[in-house]
Design a protein with these regions (language model features):
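Short hydrophobic beta-strand element within catalytic cores of glycosyltransferases
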Residues: 316-319, 329
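Short, structured helix-loop element that forms part of the nucleotide-activated donor/catalytic region
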Residues: 242, 247-272, 283, 359
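Conserved acidic donor-binding segment of nucleotide-sugar-dependent glycosyltransferases
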Residues: 331-332, 336-343, 352-358
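Conserved donor-binding/catalytic core segment of Leloir-type glycosyltransferases
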Residues: 4, 147, 188-226, 232-236, ...
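Short alpha-helical donor nucleotide-sugar binding micro-motif in glycosyltransferases
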Residues: 140, 278-279, 286-291
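Aromatic "clamp/platform" in nucleotide-sugar-dependent glycosyltransferases that forms part
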Residues: 299
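Carbohydrate-associated surface elements
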Residues: 152, 171
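Glycosyltransferase donor-sugar binding loop
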Residues: 43-44, 172, 219, 245-260, ...
Length: 395
């Protein structure tokens, strides 16, 4: 089959949307399908279009315009042009709003089945945004199939418009995301880590006041939605009882979030907080293995890739019961669940794990077993292929 994947973000863009779209694009050619990714890019001029093909995936990026509606028109016209050159069998959009609307409308126009995948923010916020409401409703009403990666998002989508929603959880490559104990011990016990000894990028270096100081980690773009204003106060509370390092693998979002972070750091200059900047997905397992505790204190979410990756790396996880987190993290079985927006509960859970190595080990091993059984790449691929085949038979 010839499958078009529409997404507002795609590798090397950062974020869960880019990661998830790229993951499916990479899996489909292994099953014999032809994949065409169509993605807007603010780094290209309006009307500029570039196509790169690698490993069976053709990625076409086109320049965005000042007006969103003009960008959507371009997106639609590119789909029509590509379809007339060599017809698509399925149009699959990642994200309910812009990509979902364009895929659904183009699918109706071209008589091609459309799949719209809800990822999190698209349904969490679009329902309250007048500018996106009509596109969201149109996609939900008219897409051939709607999927999502979290059971909580199924409920929210059905509340928006009552129709069948198919649950397809994210999959994780457990051969790549796995515990790397030797590197973890090396990096945690050295006061200054030489890049040549770690095998990590040259800008990664970490000083510790004690070789026995433990590390709490977060992965992703730290911002208010991801619990920035909860994590930092909780970390300060932890340090009142036990000196600890906070390792942020990723970036802090610019603007108000960065201002809050800088002001917090000014008020707490003695806290050990390290921000790595963007890290290639290929290097992430090394960084997960640095963490004695992984935290994901989101206020809203889909099914966070970072939580699944950390669990696959046998990290004990502390997370909040939002989005699809409860689909994977079972409190006290393979991780700890704390209320969202509650710094005291978060700090208590972190301390509980820092002070109990057997508990950390037990939860970490159970976490990896959960991923290996229920959140595999093969399962994600099989569910999508089953969906495509059903649509093709109906068509």
């Amino acid at each position: 089959m010839k499958i078009a994947l529409l997404s507002e973000k795609y590798t090397p863009d950062i974020g869960g949307l880019a990661i998830s779209t790229e993951r499916l694009a990479r899996l489909l050619p292994s099953a014999g399908h032809h994949v065409y990714v169509l993605c807007p890019s603010p780094n290209l001029l309006p009307s500029e279009k570039r196509t790169l093909t690698s490993n069976g995936v053709s990625v076409t990026r086109f320049g965005t315009r000042k007006r969103v509606d003009d960008t959507l028109v371009d997106w639609f016209e590119i789909i029509v042009e590509e379809h007339r050159r060599a017809p698509f069998d399925v149009l699959h959009a990642y994200f309910l709003t812009q990509a979902g609307f364009v895929a659904t409308y183009a699918g109706k126009y071209l008589n091609v089945p459309s799949v719209v995948s809800i990822r999190g923010n698209d349904i969490e916020r679009a329902a309250f945004d007048p500018a996106r409401f009509s596109h969201t409703l149109y996609a939900l009403q008219n897409a051939s199939v709607v999927t999502t990666n979290a059971s909580e998002l199924v409920k929210k989508a059905k509340a928006f418009f009552d129709r069948d929603i198919i649950l397809i959880p994210n999959g994780i490559d457990t051969d790549h995301f796995k515990p790397l104990e030797q590197i973890s011990r090396l990096l945690q016990t050295m006061r200054l880590i030489p890049p040549e000894a770690s095998g990590l990028p040259s800008y990664f270096g970490m000083k510790q006041t004690s070789p026995f100081q433990l590390t709490v980690g977060f992965v992703g773009e730290l911002r208010e939605k991801k619990g920035l204003k909860v994590l930092l106060p909780a970390f300060a509370q932890v340090n009142q009882k036990r000196p600890t390092t906070l390792l942020i693998v990723g970036v802090v979002r610019q603007g108000e979030d960065k201002q809050f972070f800088d002001e917090f750091f000014t008020l707490h200059p003695n806290l050990q907080i390290f921000v790595t900047g963007f890290i290639s997905p290929g290097d992430l397992p090394h960084y997960y293995s640095l963490m004695d505790v992984f935290v994901h204190p989101s206020l809203r979410d889909g099914l966070p890739n970072a939580v699944l990756e950390a669990m696959a790396c046998e990290r004990p996880v502390v997370a909040t019961p939002v989005g699809g987190v409860l689909d994977v993290v079972k409190d006290s079985e393979n991780g700890l669940i704390v209320p969202a927006n509650d710094a005291e509960s978060l700090s208590n859970a972190i301390l509980k794990l820092l002070e109990d190595q057997p508990l950390r080990n037990r939860l970490g091993k159970a976490a990896r077993e959960t991923i290996q059984k229920e959140f595999t790449l093969q399962k994600e691929l099989d569910l999508n292929l089953k969906l495509y085949k059903t649509l093709r038979l109906k068509d």
